[in-house]
């Protein structure tokens, strides 16, 4: 190897330079190539869905943050390096044996600019990239407005705390990072060039090093003073008193807040003492100031509040925390919209006073009682409506309502989607998987309040064709025949929850002009996609990009891809909304509806904040389990609004965002940040609005908060005596809370069907029923919450107690033993329904599923029995239990003959139910069990009792029940004042 003359750097041969250059290029391509591909694909996709302005705004915001933070950090660090380098000692002994940094110093001296600029720029870019994730804070600060509500402590508008304060904190944090990095860079540079020597016995520091380090240390302390000042405002979101309440308490206001001001003053004095090192050589002054700051932070900022909390607040907490609990109550009600303007409270006895058949509201409620459980029937839908092995329904079906022939009816609904996971054999070939099996077929609904027929023979239930949904199918076949209960003009489904489970998730549609259709449509027809959705891959550049993205060379060589081909990506409705509106939080349960003849997914979207002063924290997301098994709570928020309703067209993927809360200042802020992306509420079609449901995620948050925040008096709030709890799910062994349920019930004023989301509530650490919460979904009253409050000493049983009472009933227990010989038992949703002018009716469907004896055989649930229960009048918590193949028979068992006539009978078609009493032969009406707190015994029966005698006894008992009813009414009249 040739070497140059002394003093010249060695030169690499030309071939070596080419290899190094090629290697660096390959490394850069590997590092940045996939990211550049993703950026270009996003550019194409956002343009296809019409939201490219969102992508550009977010990108420019993040680039601006990167540039600003990188410039500040790199500038400060570079200035520190430059000052330290220029003020280095003129002579530093270059003796490696005595100076361990001498080789490094020599290397730096050969290329000082490269090292200086390289370190500064690298640190700046890294900090800028990390800071770019704060783009949401920047946009909220730039476009934020006011709430029109001021905080109770400082008198500032809430907008300051949620829009401005997070931005100020972020700016302060990055300034702090920049100054600390500059201090460290100065320290290392002075050490490298001899301004700081540690090799001598006591060390040495040059004047230039002392001044520079002191200035940067003073800047750090000065920034800490600003941090103490901002800490004062963040006390209003303090978690010191959690779980009792959120926000500043007595200790925060009377100890922490003054302590922050004291620490601000001390930090400023400490910073000034560091700056005096510019003129004074004695470093003991800043050292003592720093010690004073640390000691003050411990004593004033830590020990003083701790002592006040321990010896002054806790012994008198109920009194001293009272005004701060009141602040928390008011803020939480406002932040979650659970205040008096949105929640109506009504006293409710919990014991029925009338026969349901005599109450118009109850007649409607009973006729609409939902017997089909969307959590159980997905496999039934799949087995009976699948058509092909590659079609499937969502694991949990949905509930919605439709007006058919003028009658409002709730339906269990699902979309027959393509299931990529169900493809087998040659169906999984790349061509078939991505170009042939591309879409689902149809919308399937079933009336939620009835089945095709009652299943009566317990021993042969699994062999009967009873207890199954009555389907209304809107697909390609029914479109051709013209027989559709719910008219759908375009039943093909290219976007959905199930179809998006493909890995990777994409379909290739279209082809060369004039080419034959290849997408599977039916057994006798194929189809070519004509929708607007999809990114064009008709040119070779885009094909190459997608071949790179999906690591699939067949994009380049397949003859199935032509000039008109497009690729459909991001097919999950929820994901599409999240991508076009990254500032929204989406509900976990999109649901399909039919609007104007098209299948559309509705996605509820929320605006959220996490710094609303004094508001209780909660989470819209359930616990998340990491791959390592660690369970983490979802994102904590302190403000939620269901401000946007989003729709995704199931055929072409069109995403539309509709404003749904004109009063939400957070949504108004985002609409200013992304103009034109959210349509005004006036543009919501009436047919679409009729299908809006109150979202489950929001309701679950609100009911958990109402369990505490229905209490008005702070002292009572502190004692927790009046709190409620969300009941555990009696049908689930995993200790989960009972999910809310959608029901169609009679409206209290008009007795017309009203679609609501409801939940029972039990007492705090008790199982007795305490309240019943329902949220209206009808357009006229959407969002209104109704709370029925039971007396605090109520003995009305809650869901878990009722479940125990029902399954321990001797009739249920004995037949369950018979059923379990060849079936698995599934208990459906336990519905709680206000009824009988003060009472609560519990209804629970019981499903059976035949135990499979062959791996190839398929089994699925069917409705076999209906359990009902009500509280016995005039007893200490006794209940009546009804158990029969139909709801009508079960109701007659608990209310007496006649009530069951208003229930919807099995049979009919999906559009209309059979007339009352047309549900087939039913056994004679049973008499309510005796009034007792114990489960009723099964009626005696045996082969030695003649049938005529049985009929005579039943008739006599029915007459006796009528006499008892008249006697109860007479007693009520006698006890009524003035009666």
Swiss-Prot record:
GO terms for cellular component: extracellular region; plasma membrane. Residues 898-948 are annotated as: Disordered. It is a multi-pass membrane protein. It comes from the Bacteria. The keyword Cell membrane applies. Its main location: membrane. The chain crosses the membrane at residues 19-39, 63-83, 114-134, 174-194, 211-231, 260-280, 288-308. It is found in: Cell membrane. Signal peptide: none annotated. Residues 913-946 have a biased composition (Pro residues). This is UPF0182 protein BCG_0095.
């Amino acid at each position: 190897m040739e070497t140059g003359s002394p003093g010249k750097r060695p030169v690499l041969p030309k071939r070596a330079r080419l290899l190094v250059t090629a290697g660096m290029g390959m490394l850069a391509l590997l590092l940045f190539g996939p990211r550049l591909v993703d950026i270009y694909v996003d550019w194409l996709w956002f343009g296809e869905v019409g939201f490219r302005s969102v992508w550009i705004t977010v990108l420019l915001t993040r680039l601006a943050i990167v540039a600003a933070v990188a410039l500040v950090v790199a500038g400060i660090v570079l200035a520190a390096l430059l000052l330290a380098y220029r003020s280095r000692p003129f002579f530093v002994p270059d003796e490696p044996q005595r100076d361990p940094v001498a080789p490094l110093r020599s290397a730096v001296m050969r290329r000082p600019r490269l090292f200086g600029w390289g370190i500064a720029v690298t640190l700046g870019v890294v900090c800028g990239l990390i800071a770019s994730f704060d783009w949401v804070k920047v946009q909220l600060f730039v476009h934020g407005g006011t709430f029109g509500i001021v905080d109770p402590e400082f008198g500032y508008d809430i907008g300051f705390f949620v829009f401005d304060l997070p931005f100020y904190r972020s700016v302060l944090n990055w300034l702090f990072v920049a100054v600390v990095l500059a201090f460290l860079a100065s320290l290392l540079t002075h050490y490298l060039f001899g301004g700081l020597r540690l090799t001598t016995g006591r060390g040495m520091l040059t004047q230039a090093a002392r001044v520079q380090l002191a200035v940067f240390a003073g800047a750090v302390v000065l920034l800490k003073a600003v941090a103490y000042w901002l800490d004062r405002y963040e006390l209003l979101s303090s978690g010191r008193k959690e779980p009792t309440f959120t926000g500043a308490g007595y200790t925060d206001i009377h100890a922490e807040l003054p302590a922050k001001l004291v620490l601000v003053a001390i930090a400023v004095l400490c910073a000034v003492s560091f700056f005096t090192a510019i003129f004074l050589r004695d470093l003991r002054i800043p050292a003592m100031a720093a010690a004073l700051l640390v000691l003050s932070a411990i004593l004033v900022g830590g020990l003083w509040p701790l002592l006040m909390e321990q010896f002054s607040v806790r012994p008198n907490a109920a009194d001293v925390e009272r005004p701060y609990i009141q602040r928390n109550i008011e803020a939480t009600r406002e932040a979650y919209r659970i205040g008096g303007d949105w929640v109506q409270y009504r006293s409710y006895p919990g014991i029925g006073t009338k026969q349901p058949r005599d109450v118009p509201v109850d007649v409607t409620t009973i006729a609409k009682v939902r017997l089909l459980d969307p959590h159980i029937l997905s496999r039934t839908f799949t087995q009976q409506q699948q058509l092909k092995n590659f079609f499937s329904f969502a694991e949990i079906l949905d509930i919605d309502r439709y007006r058919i022939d003028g009658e409002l009816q709730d339906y269990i609904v699902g979309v027959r989607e393509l299931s990529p996971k169900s493809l087998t054999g040659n169906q999984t070939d790349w061509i078939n998987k991505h170009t042939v099996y591309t879409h689902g077929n149809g919308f399937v609904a079933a009336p939620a309040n009835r089945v095709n027929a009652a299943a009566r023979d317990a021993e042969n239930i699994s062999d009967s064709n009873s207890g199954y949904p009555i389907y209304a199918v809107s697909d390609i076949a029914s479109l051709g025949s013209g027989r559709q209960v719910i008219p759908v003009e375009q039943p093909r489904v290219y976007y959905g929850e199930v179809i998006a489970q493909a890995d990777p998730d994409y379909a290739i549609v279209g082809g060369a002009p004039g080419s034959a259709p290849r997408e599977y449509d039916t057994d006798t027809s194929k189809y070519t996609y004509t929708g607007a959705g999809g990114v064009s891959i008709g040119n070779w550049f885009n094909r190459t990009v997608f071949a790179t993205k999906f690591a699939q060379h067949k994009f380049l060589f397949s003859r199935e891809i032509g000039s008109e081909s497009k690729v459909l990506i991001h097919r999950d409705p929820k994901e599409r909304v999240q991508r076009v509106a990254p500032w929204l939080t989406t509900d976990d349960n999109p649901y399909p509806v039919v609007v104007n003849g098209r299948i559309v997914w509705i996605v509820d979207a929320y605006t959220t904040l996490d710094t609303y002063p004094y508001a209780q924290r909660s989470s819209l997301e359930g616990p998340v389990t990491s791959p390592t098994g660690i369970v983490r709570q979802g994102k904590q928020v302190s403000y939620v609004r269901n401000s946007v309703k989003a729709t995704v067209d199931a055929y072409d993927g069109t995403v539309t965002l509709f404003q749904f809360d004109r009063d939400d200042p957070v949504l108004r802020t985002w609409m200013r940040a992304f103009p034109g992306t959210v349509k005004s509420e006036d543009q919501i079609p009436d047919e679409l609005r009729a299908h809006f449901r109150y979202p489950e995620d929001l309701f679950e948050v609100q009911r958990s908060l109402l369990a505490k925040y229905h209490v008005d008096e702070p002292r009572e709030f502190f004692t927790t005596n009046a709190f409620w709890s969300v009941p555990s799910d009696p049908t689930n062994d995993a200790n989960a809370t009972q999910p809310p349920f959608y029901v169609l019930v009679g409206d209290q004023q008009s007795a017309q069907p009203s679609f609501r989301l409801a939940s029972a509530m039990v007492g705090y650490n008790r199982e007795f029923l305490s309240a019943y919460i329902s949220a209206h979904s009808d357009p006229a009253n959407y969002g209104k919450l109704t709370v029925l409050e039971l007396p605090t000493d109520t003995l009305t049983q809650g869901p878990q107690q009722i479940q125990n009472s029902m399954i321990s009933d001797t009739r249920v227990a004995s037949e369950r033993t018979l059923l379990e010989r060849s079936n698995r038992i599934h208990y459906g949703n336990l519905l709680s329904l206000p009824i009988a002018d003060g009472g609560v009716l519990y209804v629970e469907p019981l499903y059976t599923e035949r135990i499979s004896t062959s791996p190839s055989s398929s089994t699925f649930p069917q409705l076999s029995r209906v359990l009902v229960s009500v509280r016995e009048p005039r007893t200490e918590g006794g209940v009546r239990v009804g158990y029969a193949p139909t709801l009508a028979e079960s109701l007659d068992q608990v209310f007496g003959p006649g009530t069951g006539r208003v229930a919807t009978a099995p049979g009919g078609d999906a559009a209309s139910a059979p007339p009352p009493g047309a549900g087939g032969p039913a056994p004679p009406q049973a008499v309510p069990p005796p009034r007792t707190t114990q489960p009723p015994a099964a009626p005696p029966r045996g082969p030695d009792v003649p049938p005529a005698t049985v009929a005579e006894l039943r008739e006599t008992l029915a007459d006796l029940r009528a006499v008892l009813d008249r006697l109860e009414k007479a007693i009520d009249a006698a006890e009524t004042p003035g009666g």
